[in-house]
UniProtKB/Swiss-Prot annotation:
Compartments (UniProt record): Plastid, Chloroplast
Taxonomic placement: Eukaryota, Viridiplantae, Streptophyta, Embryophyta, Tracheophyta
One GO MF term: RNA binding
Protein name: Maturase K
Keyword set, alphabetical order: Chloroplast, mRNA processing, Plastid, RNA-binding, tRNA processing
The keyword tRNA processing is assigned to this record: yes
Name of the gene this protein is made from: matK
Annotated family: Belongs to the intron maturase 2 family. MatK subfamily.
Amino acid sequence: MDEFHRYGKEDSSWQQCFLYPLFFQEDLYAISHDHYLDGSSSSEPMEHFSFNDQLSFLTVKRLIGRIREQNHSIGLFVNCDPNPLVDRNKSSYFESVLEGLTLVLEVPFSTRSKYSVQGIKEWKSFRSIHSIFPFLEEKFPHSNYILDTRIPYSIHPEFLVRTFRRWIQDAPSLHPLRSVLYEYRNSPENLQRSIIVAPRVNTRFFLFLWNHYAYECESILVPLLKRSFQSRSSSHGSFPERTLFDRKIKHIIRISHRNSLKSIWFLKDPKIHYVRYGERSIIAIKGTHLLVKKCRYYLPIFRQCYFHLWSEPYRVCSHQLSKNCSSFPGYSLGVRMKPLLVRTKMPGELFITDLITDEFYPIVPIVSIIGLLAREKFCDISGRPISKLAWTSLTDDDILDRFDRIWRNFFHYYSGSFGRDGLYRIKYILSLSCAKTLACKHKSTIRVVRKELGPELFKKSFSKEREFDSPAFSSKAVARSQRERIWHSDIPQINPLANSWQKIQDLKIKNLFDQ
């Protein structure tokens, strides 16, 4: 497989023309089996897989023979496995095909993504959770509306096959993909014309399908929106007056051509800011209410015409930039004005000008977090800490580690938000709930637990400065962290609050449209 990767880097056409023979190699399924074992031991467990611990090469040989005999009238999994077809999620055949198919298609897809990102310099796609933080730090000098969109889950399997066919020259390699998709669509639990792909489906194959599907959606839509908004008008920068405006703009752009090409991009404002994580994306644009309303109607029509998808109206919402405009993802986002002092020195005179720019103001949604902690039995609905009775059978170290892990995840995720009062309240709830859990386990009081286990117990687990124990962080860095916003880049996955809170918000919006 390493040799296949090496040849693919040298010649991308080689990997597109010779993918189908890989399905007849027994080593492919051994590699896919190892990939499954590695994925099951990672931080994102694959709950839907039940792959056998020992790989049966007899099963692999039967599978390869079935692929050779495959045609349009014969299913890939019919009468091939001793397990019933209804329990296909536990079938070793089905899991082997999913893992092997994903492993083969990931190689040209990764190469295509790398070349496309290098080729398109005017647009950088944001597809990682770490891209949320630069977006929250970004300034919005001219944007006045936000489009909150959600990519539809349901998609016809033939469309996925055709999108792969655009950039894979080896057409026979897509036959197993078509068989897998149609077998999944025709299953008893999924009898419908389309299949469901979503980022929350915790399998390697469907996560790969979702990433490819979302990549196709945004790689076409976002550059189209950028060109549309750039062609409307040029930004007037920070000129305080409008006298002879067109002449000044032409003069500056002509000078920029002679001096530096980068100055053109400084003057021309793209008027659009885009970020996506999972199925939800935010687009900050500049325009009138009528223009934003047209965009709301354009996005569903665009998906319907190009991707053959029907999107519910509530999946595209618009908000005006205001104090509390949106929530993404797990943050309560507001917009505040940030003044910038500019000094302009001219011969004999000095001008001082205040420029006002808008920036996001993310705060901790303490009410929603308390509701989440109440559902998990850490506190009641009013935020009063209670003992976690389900953990009383664990050891003291396990209880402390679990509470510490929860607090560390909250601290990492919301460390860059404005206002730490919400974080301190979460820390108080978790620390007191931990103390009550230990007291309930030992059948004593909180005071006795503190006295027996020592005063350093909770200080070690819930220390505020424990994130800066590394020698790379000096005392000045710790002091600066109390004043400035610091985003932690070691977040393994999105906070569970984001998904639970977003479900509530989607339900509220859907109810408004149904009324």
